[in-house]
Amino acid sequence: MGPLFTTIPGAHSGPMRPLPKKHVEPMAVRQLLLGNSTMIRHTCPMSVPLSRQVKEVAAQKPSEDIYKNRQRRQQQQQQQQQQQQLDLLFHQRIQISLWPRKQKRRKTEQHSHPFVKKAFRFSAGPGCRRPSSNKMLRSMGGGQRPMGLGSEFFRLLHDLHLLAFATKRIWIHRRGEATARPRAPEHPAPPATAVRGRDAASQNLKRRPGSGTDGLRLQGAEPSRLLRTYAGGAVIPTGTPERAQPPPPQDPLGRRRWLSRNTWGPWPGTTQPPSPQLLRNDWGSCGFMVPEAARGKVFQDSQEGAHIRRETVSKSVCAEPWRHQRARDPAPTNFPLKCQKQRGASTSSGQHGGRVNLVFFIDSPTVIAVPDLQCPTKYSGILY
């Protein structure tokens, strides 16, 4: 009898036996004889035999031997079929090809096994054959390609797990499945000029040898697709030079655009250039030495504010230089402040050593001086 399970190398191992037939007669005949029609309808809808057989079985009396009758009937049918085949062959009404390229399969003959079902799917649906008309060719979606036996064969191998591709399945153009998408062009085409008339519809189609623009060109006329128009629609005469394109915008500071992937100029880690205000007032970042008069005040007067700024900048005591990209964050929590003892800065000694955090507003002359309690707070010297 041989093994029940056979393993093809590379394939999934499964029962190598035919699937059960759709029409299972003995059960149906038995139930017909019992006369229970509801049971037939509920238990086995697929196993109800053809109506002719039902009539024959119902016409028999239950005492007759059904199985003998059926055997006799099968023999008769086989003989009839053989006779018909011989007749056909003899009269040569049929051409026999050993392996037909395409077979029409009825739905009932399709196997219920998932791999096999997927392999035979190519024979159904409109997406597989060549487009029959021009209109279909235009309206067709992207993924449909006409294909010959080659791809069918390879897809069959693939679906039966006899063929494994590590790459994307580029060769399968089936609707709704993963296909390789076309890359976007690096330099997109310039926008098309205004096109009027029937050429507007066919503008995006590939030109075929019979199309209208070729006919026009053969007659010496220029197709309207190639005519440039003004904004109002008037045709620009051929030979007019195009307006010169403006040169690409230069970098304002004239330095190389990208030193590495994410840098701008000499400030590493920043994508944007620092604002000109930041470049002008390049303060130190942490504890500022301020005259006693400035402590805790808000300066509205521009001259006084500017004076405080100047004095503060000249006396700033801090080891950490200002990082320019921090100016974009309203409250950076993470920049390291190495606050040092005052190096001989003359201040009147106070509760916190005369150290004050100034908050500068870049757009206005306002300066807020806030005394700090622990050496500088982590918000010291922030620009708002």
From Swiss-Prot:
Disordered: annotated segments: 1-21, 60-84, 177-255, 326-350
TM regions (residue ranges): none
Biased composition (Low complexity): 74-84
Biased composition (Basic and acidic residues): 177-186
Family according to the record: Belongs to the FAM157 family.
Protein name: Putative protein FAM157B
Gene this protein is translated from: FAM157B
